[in-house]
Amino acid sequence: MPMEALHACTRVVYLGPQSTIVTARSMDWASDMGTNLWAFPRGMKRDGAAGAKSIRWTSKYGSVVAAGFDAGTADGMNEKGLVANLLYLTESEYVKPTPNDKRKPLSVSAWTQYVLDNYATVAEAVKDLRKEPFYVVPTMTPDGKPGQLHLSISDATGDSAIFEYVGGKLNIHHSREFQVMTNSPVYDQQIALNNYWEQIGGTTMLPGTNRAADRFVRASFYINAIPKTSNINEAIAAVFSVIRNASVPLGITTPGQPNISSTLWRSVSDHKNKRYFFESTRSPNVFWVNLSDMDFAEGKPTKKLTLTNGAVFAGNTAAQFKPAEPFKFLAAEVK
């Protein structure tokens, strides 16, 4: 079975009027990731969890994130409205460092958090990351899957960038037009496939399988077909409908692919109002976190909202986060 069928995710960005920018993603995985939400303050001392030479930094911005296995940041938004989404990419081929490589190693489990900690906008992140202060080091996930991933970021202006390691080199795709990302193939090929379907037209026919290329086409059509509105509640509802359309139903099986992964959860980020919405596919409610209600001041404790063990939330959950020791990023070994 192709790995992209096992770990299928989708990300979309809605570009509405009057700075109504909304980013959504689905998390599809073959096993329960034990996802919890975390709130990190400014001023946290970090290291890249990739050995003694790992890159080190201090967080400039507070953030609310969704952690996979409480071992890595999969998704999140920082207090400046920058959103980062980590998705699977089977074709990832990471850097093979040279003996005198000046870049510092960074575990793939900390890649998303590095971006949220350090940048306020996509343009700022792209400018700095083109210099490659680090290289990403893969590691196996706690459930034994290869950590082959690519990263999308979006900001309050509607700007987007995609970061992929292909053939041992970092590729960056930077444009407001890059509203959609799924999994395989690599991003330039995803764009080419979508261009073909745009010529056919989404009102004529859309591909309907749960393959990454088909989800890319459907998401691209619908995110631009839904009404453009400055009513943020209408916009969020519409974006939820798009990301649900690209999701994989719970327990679905496909002939020849009996273990295809279902969608575990979805997040929707309201960049303008700094709200992070979360929907577990096993919960009856959508809830959210108003980042403006979180105290991200340096020296404040890390906080956690525990979602495991059947917890159910509704409304703004900012006050329900509890102080907790921060999780440790899954360590990677430089080879």
Segments from the language model and where they lie:
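Catalytic cofactor-binding cores of redox enzymes
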Residues: 131-167
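C-terminus-biased signal that marks the final domain/tail of proteins
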Residues: 7-22, 137-139, 146-147, 156, ...
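C-terminal segment of classical bacterial N-terminal signal peptides
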Residues: 1-7
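Short, surface-exposed beta-strand-loop junctions and turns on beta-sheet-rich folds
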Residues: 29-31, 90-92, 168-170, 282-286
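Compact, glycine/acidic-enriched structural inserts
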Residues: 38-56, 93-134, 300-311
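A contiguous strand-loop segment
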Residues: 8-103, 136, 315, 319-320
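A short, structured loop/turn motif at beta-sheet edges
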Residues: 78-80, 116-124, 229-235, 271-273
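Structural recognition of the beta-strand scaffold that forms the well-ordered cores
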Residues: 22-24, 83-86, 152-154, 162, ...
